[in-house]
A protein has these predicted regions:
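N-terminal positioning helix adjacent to the helix-turn-helix/winged-helix DNA-binding module
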Residues: 5, 12-19
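Hydrophobic/aromatic-rich alpha-helical bundle segments in the mid-to-C-terminal region
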Residues: 120-129, 141-194
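N-terminal intrinsically disordered/low-complexity leader segments
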Residues: 1-9, 192-194
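Helix-turn-helix
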Residues: 15, 23-57, 61
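Amphipathic alpha-helical segments used for helix-helix packing
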Residues: 86-89, 100-128
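Hydrophobic alpha-helical connector segments
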Residues: 61, 75-106, 144, 155
Length: 194
């Protein structure tokens, strides 16, 4: 395969994954057809199987890559001179109006979690792996000794729940209250600096 063809194939594969991620957020896995994914990527349906073995293969990879990219991007935005400050900057970014309203590039979890639970394997394993990886990285950032992992898990649950509820009632006062409550509870969850 020539370099040009290899690059074109790589670009097509990326476009398919971007389209699938957008559909995952908007409709979920079950309601997203291969035809819809390919249409969103600006490609013909016939080319799909040059890139992925099945719809399941595509969405498993989207869950892995999309979750990883989202979490890694969030962790890279961490700012502050202390572990607490960096962790709070992550929670504030995640629970921001901008992130809530960014349906096409935000976190995959609110749109995917319930469906992944119903769909079972291999989706569940893919998501579990990515969540575990984020928890490990977040726990290292929190740096709260023996409680680091527990706090990272608690914060992830809090962040996801607040964002999910906020998105469900977006455009209302209650939506903003969910984000604010998530931020306040995050502050309480993290160890105070000495």
């Amino acid at each position: 395969m020539t370099n040009r063809k290899a690059k074109q194939k790589q670009e097509s594969r990326a476009a398919i994954q971007v389209s699938a991620a957008a559909l995952l957020r908007e409709r979920g896995i079950k309601a997203s057809s291969v035809m819809d994914v390919m249409k969103g990527a600006g490609l013909t349906v016939g080319g799909f199987y040059n890139h992925f073995d099945s719809k399941e293969d595509l969405f498993v990879q989207v869950l892995q890559n999309g979750s990883r990219a989202n979490w890694n991007g969030l962790l890279k935005l961490a700012r502050g001179d202390s572990p607490r400050a960096r962790a709070l900057s992550v929670t504030r970014q995640y629970l921001s109006h901008k992130h809530r309203d960014c349906k096409d590039a935000g976190c995959l979890l609110p749109g995917a979690a319930a469906e992944v639970a119903r769909a079972g394997e291999p989706y569940r394993s893919a998501l579990e792996k990515e969540l575990s990886s984020f928890i490990k990285s977040f726990a290292q950032m929190i740096d709260a000794g023996n409680e680091s992992r527990e706090k990272a898990v608690a914060l992830l649950v809090l962040m996801y729940g607040a964002l999910s509820l906020s998105q469900a009632v977006a455009g209302t006062r209650l939506s903003n209250e969910f984000l604010q409550a998530g931020k306040k509870l995050s502050e309480r969850c993290l160890p105070r600096e000495t």
